[in-house]
Amino acid sequence: MGGASRNERRRRQEAVAPRPSVDRVPGSGRKDNRVKVGILVAVVIVVVFATIFVVLNRPWGSSTQATAASYPVAVDGVVVTAGQASAPVTIDVYEDFLCPFCERFETRNADGLTAALNEGKVKVNYHALNILDARTTPPGYSTLAANAALCAVPAGIWPAYHARLFAEQPAEGSAGLTAAQLSAIGTSLGAGPAFTQCVEGNGNAAAITAATAAASANPELQTDGQFGTPTIAVGGRKIDVSDSDWLQTVLAAG
């Protein structure tokens, strides 16, 4: 009878004892979590590196000018003056449309200068030169582009055209843009037939060359006896624009 009682108790214990799980391996939950975390980290790394790649490989000229120009523009000879004649500060910008550092200056400072011009705080004399004329094949793109920029003033498209010349800047050593291509840019901005005739005639070439020689020989625009573009001058003297706050400093000095 005692054996029967023991057998009965054993059957009851087996009936209520928990059965081992057959679909879960000890520690598998922790492993699944590690896999999920690893995948998430990998995705984040891919996104970060993709963002860095896009930023580092963005062309300088791809930036668009966010501030719309509302200032007046006039031309005197081969100098384009942007802004109100009564503005308290005058800045002179010497540039070459083939010069990559000029393109960088334009990209970095276009919005700040445009805002100051719109508000009447400054006027800017733009001197488009041809010091890099020999850097295209055939030579002459710097002159052709400088002439086209002058043609853009009476056509009423100078601010936008000036920006486009840098946004579509050809590489040194290339053929550069042709007169037909420069005319097409102006036409896309609303210029009429007179603009095309002005660009193709290249009538300011000699004056641009003379202005380049005069600027290059001006000791107030040189550093260690050398002239280059871009050169930025206030009161006729070259200033350092490597500081990102240079414009605010100039405006504050009045």
What are these regions (language model features)?
Residues 85, 117-119, 223-226:
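Extracellular/periplasmic catalytic domains that process cell-envelope and extracellular macromolecules
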